[in-house]
Amino acid sequence: MRARHRVALKVLADLRSWAAEYPQVLEATPIEALAISTAAISPWRGANELRLSAPDVRCGPTPLDDHVEQNVRSLDELDDLFGRCEAIVRGGDRDDGHPLLASLSGWQSALERAPHYPKLAGLWGDRFAEALRGERYDWTAGLARDRGEGPSDPQEYLTYAASSNAWITHFPRWATSDRDDLLDGLPVLDNALEAIEVAVRLSNDLATFERERAEPGQNNILMYDTSPDWVHDELDRHSRKAQEQLDPLATAGFPPAVELLRLLDWSVTFYSGADFRGWGSDRDLTGPSGLPSDM
């Protein structure tokens, strides 16, 4: 337990250093939650190994979400931003035109030096693009919902569950792995992580619905033709699917499978008690912490 705490503190210090370079976009990022999560999912890894595995600050899923929700005003602007993100990820292009893009450029450059990255680059580019398509869907659906015209089919929503960014935030653990047999297990890991992505999306939606229902431009599964019971059933179904795929590898002592099971357990458990927002350095000190009283 003490070792995990030390790792979390080292990761937190690293994230704070990175956030200080881009205060325009990262000052409201809940970096404490990200540091704790990173250490909890991979407690046997050292802080140096996890430096690339805390990309919520670096490549921007959390700050990118914020920027898109708060600052993007047109679909053309959104498509331009996402196109530049893809150019960085797929082509290695450096882009300093915006702090988010500069941060992503630096992180991508470091990621490309990871041992398994060359063989995983194509998969990384495809899954990153899939996450951006999910973000785009959420943005357009939220805009339509503000006009009273939002989509209602929950299965359509789940098609874009990559907007949870669970896949792209976990990927660095594969790229930096020292396991020579990682690629042998990759098909199972990839399929399981896609199921986990849906579970994370649903558990996040359950945690954030009360906040998001009062905010413009939001898109949440509970805004569709669903109920909390339906969402919990789908969450359980996708969790079981991932567990059934991963259990044989985890039982055999394959660390990448264990990490995915820990990612699933940590995410669902955390979101069952709290929204990631509002209990760390991003907390509004004039209001309640948002942290569950038993944590």
From Swiss-Prot:
pH curve summary: Optimum pH is 7.0.
Biological-process GO terms, alphabetical: antibiotic biosynthetic process
Leader sequence segment: none
Kindly list the cofactors needed. a divalent metal cation
Listed pathway(s): Antibiotic biosynthesis
What is written in the cofactor note of this entry?
A: Activity is highest with Mg(2+). Can also use Co(2+), Zn(2+) and Ni(2+).
GO MF annotation list: ent-pimara-9(11),15-diene synthase activity
Against InterPro entries, the record matches this protein to:
Isoprenoid_synthase_dom_sf (IPR008949)
> What Enzyme Commission number(s) apply to this enzyme?
4.2.3.31
Instruction: Cite the record's statement on how activity depends on temperature.
Output: Optimum temperature is 30 degrees Celsius.
Catalyses: ent-copalyl diphosphate = ent-pimara-9(11),15-diene + diphosphate
Keywords attached to this Swiss-Prot or TrEMBL record, sorted alphabetically, are: Antibiotic biosynthesis, Lyase
Q: Which family does it belong to?
A: Belongs to the terpene synthase family.
Q: What does this protein do?
A: Involved in viguiepinol biosynthesis. Catalyzes the conversion of copalyl diphosphate (ent-CDP) into pimara-9(11),15-diene (PMD).
Its assembly, as annotated, is: Monomer.
Protein name according to UniProt: Ent-pimara-9(11),15-diene synthase
The source organism is Streptomyces sp. (strain KO-3988)
At the highest ranks, the source species' classification is: Bacteria, Bacillati, Actinomycetota, Actinomycetes, Kitasatosporales
